[in-house]
Amino acid sequence: MRMNGRLPEANYADCANGYRIHYLDEGQGDAVVFLHGSGPGASGYSNFKTNYPSLVEAGYRCIIPDHIGYGFSDKPTDVDHPLSFFVECIKQTLDVAGVKKCTLVGNSLGGAIALGLALEYPALVEKLILMAPGGLSDLPEYQQMPGMQKVFKVFGSGEPVTPEVMKDLFATGLMHDPRYATDELVEERMQIMQIMNGHVMATMQVPVLVDRLHELECPVLGFWGMDEKMMPENGIMAMARNIKHLRLILVTECGHWVMVEHEAMFNRACVDFLLYG
């Protein structure tokens, strides 16, 4: 592993579909795979740098990929990005990494990808940890959320996205506590945004998965911040009413990133769930 600017660069999976997916691979033991969300400059490390070390310390092998179109992974412009494409890229990355069974930890888009993997490859997924996952509401509902409206406004204006604009977007669109929109976070995201293109977000398609949630047989731990500005809160009841084996934690004073704003609680809860279900 080496540092590339502010971000670590480590392993690349040459997937069967011809794309290269970048991923970190730390620790030994049962595999836990962290799936990051969407947004400008997103990467696995930036989303989960304060979480996966605690699980490595607890005795788990942690794999942190960058989704296709994000981080240091390939960024194709000649293919659309439906949920199934993200799912297959992660499945093929895990094949390369030799992972036969794992727990998936997914936030936002990463939560939708985790659900897609668990539904399409149930033998692969032992447990799910979901933080405000996508795939629980339809597009018009997302478009009404204030955080989403802020994203559309910033990136639809045609104006350059400066570090100051990025910081304000995170502080007011994603976080409950703006102190977590740190200069370090902004620098990490700005670095990746310089090498991203708009194709991934322009062609992303995430279907509503609510009607399939009853198919999940694995234990699920869910988190939802009560100051969530990105995901419609009907997702809370969608999970509660349709997932059979669910433990759901509602967190006050928390926005879209429970793993950032409440990292100690989140890390403890994840280790407890991994140990005891």
Label every PLM stretch briefly.
Residues 260-272:
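Post-His helix in hydrolase/transferase enzymes
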Residues 16, 24, 57, 64-105, ...:
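Active-site loop/oxyanion-hole signature of alpha/beta-hydrolase fold enzymes
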Residues 215-254, 268:
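Conserved loop-alpha-helix segment in the C-terminal half of the alpha/beta-hydrolase fold
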Residues 1-20:
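N-terminal cap/lid segment of alpha/beta-hydrolase-fold proteins
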Residues 16-72:
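Conserved HGGG/HGGXW glycine-rich cap/lid loop of the alpha/beta-hydrolase fold
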Residues 159-218:
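Conserved alpha/beta-hydrolase catalytic His-Asp/Glu region
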Residues 106, 110, 114:
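Gly/Ala-rich beta-loop-alpha elbow adjacent to hydrolase catalytic centers
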Residues 115, 119, 126-159:
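Flexible "cap/lid" loop of the alpha/beta hydrolase fold
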